[in-house]
Structures are given as structure tokens and as C-alpha cells.
Design a protein with these regions (language model features):
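Catalytic-domain carbohydrate-binding cleft regions of carbohydrate-active enzymes
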Residues: 1-202
Length: 202
């Protein structure tokens, strides 16, 4: 902290947030058996307390492209459970192709969550889009992957290696594994290469 020597801002924020959640739960007669803190990227060392996400992003193709890279490298800074606001948090318009590609990408991340600012200009409910059938299929694929996700989560728990990881974790001697920064492994058996550009001709 810039105010107190040897005090981590992330630790203090999460400590305060967690205690407030516990206080609210107890006062309402609820007792969380497995509480979770979901926190944006806070720098090196912030992986120790929360599940991480990329922060409030813009609904743009360039953002989706960057998140493919950012997600593949989350393991490098010890984020084993990582996510992002599927569809983007703010800005842009309701682009059905962008939302589909983002949702498909999100299927292969540990945290699968749509989210945005509360705004009449941003829609995240899949049934409101003309390509609902395709969006629904992506969600169904995520559900079909639950046994795989559970196995990958257990391996992450046992090894400390993230569910998403760069290709060079699997093939450290292969030079090309360092070149494809926007591709990553999802668990041991799925290689993900997200589409983050619109189709030619719209």
C-alpha cells in the first residue's frame, strides 16, 4: 500500500469484502460453506485470494483477441481459475457475431460468466439475439463438458497448474508453441484456438 508499509491492497480489499459477505450471510441466517471472491486482475500476487477475471472490458473484436492471449497466460502468474465478462462489460453494440464468438471462447475458460453494465444498449440474454440457436448450443456444450471440467479442476487443485495454459507448458521444446500466443490448452486434452475476427463479408 502506498499508505502503509508492507500492506497489500489486494489482501486488505478481499479481507474486508469477505468479512462483509460473512457478516451479511450470518445476519440473514445463511452460512456459506464454500465462499468465493471474484476479483479483477490486481497484479502479481493477487492470485492468492480470489478467482480472477480480466476486469471491465470493452465489447470489441480487438478486446476478444487480446483476451485470448491474456487467458492463455493467466497460469504464468498463478491464476488457476480465470475468467472475463463474456461479451464485454461496456461500450460497443449488440453484435451477434461478436457475442457468439466470445461465448464460444468462454466455454473453454474455467469461469463461464456473461456480464455487462446495466444499460439498455447492452444485452447479454442469449434468447434476445437472432442467432439464439447457435448461442444456446455453446451453452449446452459447456454443460456437456462438466465431467471434463471437474477432472481438470481436480488436477488444478492437485498440481497448482491452471486449467488454461500456454501451449509451451505442454511442448516446451517446440519453438512454435511460443509463437501462437492466442491459442491455449484447456485441461490436458483440448487445444483452443478462438476466433476473434469477424467473418469476411460480414
Amino acid at each position: 500500500s502506498r499508505y502503509t508499509d508492507n500492506l497489500s491492497n489486494t489482501f486488505w480489499l478481499n479481507y474486508t469484502f469477505f468479512n462483509d459477505q460473512v457478516r451479511q450471510s450470518v445476519s440473514e441466517g445463511r452460512y456459506a460453506q464454500r465462499p468465493v471472491i471474484y476479483h479483477r486482475w490486481g497484479g502479481l500476487g493477487s492470485h492468492r485470494y480470489p478467482i480472477g477475471f480480466s476486469g471491465d472490458t470493452f465489447s470489441k473484436w480487438t478486446t476478444l483477441g487480446y483476451l485470448a492471449y491474456f487467458t492463455s497466460n493467466a497460469s504464468n502468474v498463478c491464476y488457476t481459475y480465470w475468467g472475463h465478462d463474456i461479451g464485454g462489460h461496456q461500450g460497443g453494440r449488440n453484435d451477434q457475431e461478436l457475442y457468439l464468438r466470445w461465448l464460444q471462447f468462454g466455454v473453454y475458460t474455467p469461469i463461464f460468466r456473461t456480464h455487462a453494465l446495466k444499460s439498455n444498449d447492452i444485452e447479454r440474454r442469449i434468447w434476445k439475439y437472432p442467432n439464439f440457436v447457435q448461442l444456446r448450443e455453446a451453452v449446452r456444450l459447456r454443460y456437456r463438458l462438466f465431467p471434463y471440467l471437474y477432472t481438470a479442476a481436480r488436477e488444478t487443485y492437485d498440481t497448482g497448474i491452471g486449467m488454461n495454459r500456454p501451449l509451451y507448458y505442454e511442448w516446451p521444446e517446440e519453438g512454435k508453441a511460443y509463437q501462437f500466443e492466442d491459442e491455449f490448452m484447456f485441461g490436458n486434452d483440448i487445444l483452443v484456438a478462438p476466433i476473434y475476427e469477424p467473418a469476411q463479408g460480414g
